[in-house]
Amino acid sequence: MLTKRIIPCLDVTLDRAGGCVVKGVEFVDLKEAGDPVELAKRYNEEGADELVFLDITASAQGRKTMIDVIERTADEVFIPLTIGGGINSIDAIRQILRAGADKVSVNTSAVKNPDFIKESSDIFGAQCIVTAIDCRRNTDIKNNPDKTILELEDGTPAWYEVVIYGGREATGIDAVQWARKAEELGSGEILLTSMDRDGTCAGYDLPITKKLSEELDIPIIASGGVGNPQHIYEGFSIGKADAALAASIFHFREYSIKEVKEYLRDREIPVRL
């Protein structure tokens, strides 16, 4: 049985002159306050299976700094590194992979131009291309007969709508149908974030996680809402996810990766310890 992966996620902003800041992180025991490379090293030592950096930088200068961060991280950390955030060209993917990243995550750019997934996958291989899907529950099923209707925890029927630009823009696209298409186009993994759950510490959105895990042949990474190890356990046991992404519970040292993995192992979830 394949082991389940635990993946810390860092939101990285690089607009500050001469430095970089990890958003929402208590800068404890870091040699350089806010340096994502130091945090990546810590997670590597704690037993993370992979890392995700989401670049929330706007400026071109920040993009160049991100390449520097990737290079420094790749020198220090020997687990797979995925980079996401504003990636919209083959050249950008090439630069990021050359700098030492193992995968890139594409989101809004793929929704706007689905062939970008195919082109990227054809050039770099499916194993390098993660399609990130941000979605939100939509209970208007009367006007959406063509959507994939799921039953929520309280029995309410709903479909899941793809949102882009960090959740600011609804698309009218069904998340299940879009995930299927992304797989067909050559995506190697799906990073699924429920915008309803993100930041709530109320647990993953299990209905959509389970649906995608059952429907698709490629791995599903669950994201959005982790507040404790039980939520990660449910993401695997109920949501059937292949990997669990979390941020604040690790950043704020509420739980170590080792503690989470031991919790999972004790409940017969296969993990690498």
UniProtKB/Swiss-Prot annotation:
<comment type="pathway">
    <text>Amino-acid biosynthesis; L-histidine biosynthesis; L-histidine from 5-phospho-alpha-D-ribose 1-diphosphate: step 5/9.</text>
</comment>
<feature type="active site">
    <location>
        <position position="11"/>
    </location>
</feature>
<dbReference type="GO" id="GO:0005737">
    <property type="term" value="C:cytoplasm"/>
</dbReference>
<comment type="subunit">
    <text>Heterodimer of HisH and HisF.</text>
</comment>
<comment type="similarity">
    <text>Belongs to the HisA/HisF family.</text>
</comment>
<dbReference type="InterPro" id="IPR013785">
    <property type="entry name" value="Aldolase_TIM"/>
</dbReference>
<dbReference type="GO" id="GO:0000107">
    <property type="term" value="F:imidazoleglycerol-phosphate synthase activity"/>
</dbReference>
<comment type="function">
    <text>IGPS catalyzes the conversion of PRFAR and glutamine to IGP, AICAR and glutamate. The HisF subunit catalyzes the cyclization activity that produces IGP and AICAR from PRFAR using the ammonia provided by the HisH subunit.</text>
</comment>
<dbReference type="InterPro" id="IPR011060">
    <property type="entry name" value="RibuloseP-bd_barrel"/>
</dbReference>
<dbReference type="InterPro" id="IPR050064">
    <property type="entry name" value="IGPS_HisA/HisF"/>
</dbReference>
<dbReference type="InterPro" id="IPR004651">
    <property type="entry name" value="HisF"/>
</dbReference>
<keyword id="KW-0456">Lyase</keyword>
<dbReference type="GO" id="GO:0000105">
    <property type="term" value="P:L-histidine biosynthetic process"/>
</dbReference>
<dbReference type="GO" id="GO:0016829">
    <property type="term" value="F:lyase activity"/>
</dbReference>
<keyword id="KW-0368">Histidine biosynthesis</keyword>
<protein>
    <recommendedName>
        <fullName>Imidazole glycerol phosphate synthase subunit HisF</fullName>
        <ecNumber>4.3.2.10</ecNumber>
    </recommendedName>
</protein>
<keyword id="KW-0963">Cytoplasm</keyword>
<keyword id="KW-0028">Amino-acid biosynthesis</keyword>
<feature type="active site">
    <location>
        <position position="134"/>
    </location>
</feature>
<dbReference type="Pfam" id="PF00977">
    <property type="entry name" value="His_biosynth"/>
</dbReference>
<dbReference type="InterPro" id="IPR006062">
    <property type="entry name" value="His_biosynth"/>
</dbReference>
